[in-house]
């Protein structure tokens, strides 16, 4: 799939302000956000629709974004009918949206694959390592890398800047070559991050 119109976005960023350049150009009426609670609070303040997607098992924040409903919407191949039907089936039985203090199912809504994934990792702290490893964020990035043919990815301030320029030049759509380049950049980013974490064991 070459062109993908950005309408459904998953966002989970540690430094919320990195989203500002993107939020400044998107059409509030045609874009919906899903993501972690803090990020969704931020995009709502900016006037966008946002739903906090959480897992039923949080474990002090260790697995808050490690949920099959989230990863299915990132990894689904929208050109395959079996994947589309699988998302619809998953949506009927997955409690995945935080509403107040309760989890509620989201039939129909969460069956839509994500068009764009934006992740901003928090910096690892050597003094508090490996507890300070960002597991969920790296997993989200790797999922989007794998499925770049179906979903765009931004993973730091520079890649968000490039995304904004690309969307402006292509009427809010991402092209396959751009998604591939972003995925390659993300793979290099994750490789550097992993190498740094490996050094922390020394």
Model-derived regions, located:
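A short, charged helix-loop
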Residues: 112, 116-127, 135-175
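Acidic/Gly/His-enriched mid-domain segments of enzyme catalytic cores or analogous surface patches
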Residues: 41-93, 102, 109-128, 135
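Short coil/turn connectors at secondary-structure junctions
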Residues: 4-8, 28-31, 46-49, 68-71, ...
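Long, charged alpha-helical interface segments
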Residues: 165-168, 172-202
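General beta-strand structural signal in soluble alpha/beta enzymes
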Residues: 11, 32-37, 51-55, 76, ...
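N-terminal glycine-/serine-/threonine-rich phosphate-binding loop
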Residues: 1-52, 56
């Amino acid at each position: 799939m070459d062109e993908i119109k950005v309408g459904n976005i998953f966002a989970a960023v540690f430094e919320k302000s990195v989203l500002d350049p993107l939020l400044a150009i998107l059409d509030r009426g045609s874009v919906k956000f899903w993501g972690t609670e803090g990020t969704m609070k931020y995009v709502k303040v900016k006037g966008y629709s946002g739903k906090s997607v959480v897992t039923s098992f949080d474990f002090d924040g260790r697995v808050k974004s490690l949920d099959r409903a989230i990863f299915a919407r990132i990894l689904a191949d929208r050109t395959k009918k079996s994947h589309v039907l699988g998302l619809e089936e998953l949506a009927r039985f997955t409690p995945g949206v935080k509403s107040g203090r309760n989890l509620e199912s989201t039939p129909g809504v969460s069956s839509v694959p994500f068009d764009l994934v934006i992740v901003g990792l928090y910096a690892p702290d050597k003094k508090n390592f490996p507890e300070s490893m960002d597991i969920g964020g790296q997993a989200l990035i790797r999922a989007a890398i794998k499925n770049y043919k179906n979903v765009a990815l931004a993973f730091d301030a520079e890649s968000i800047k490039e995304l904004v320029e690309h969307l402006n030049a292509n009427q809010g759509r991402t092209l396959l070559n751009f998604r591939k380049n972003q995925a390659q950049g993300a793979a290099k980013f994750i490789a550097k991050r992993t190498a740094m974490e490996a050094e922390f064991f020394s």
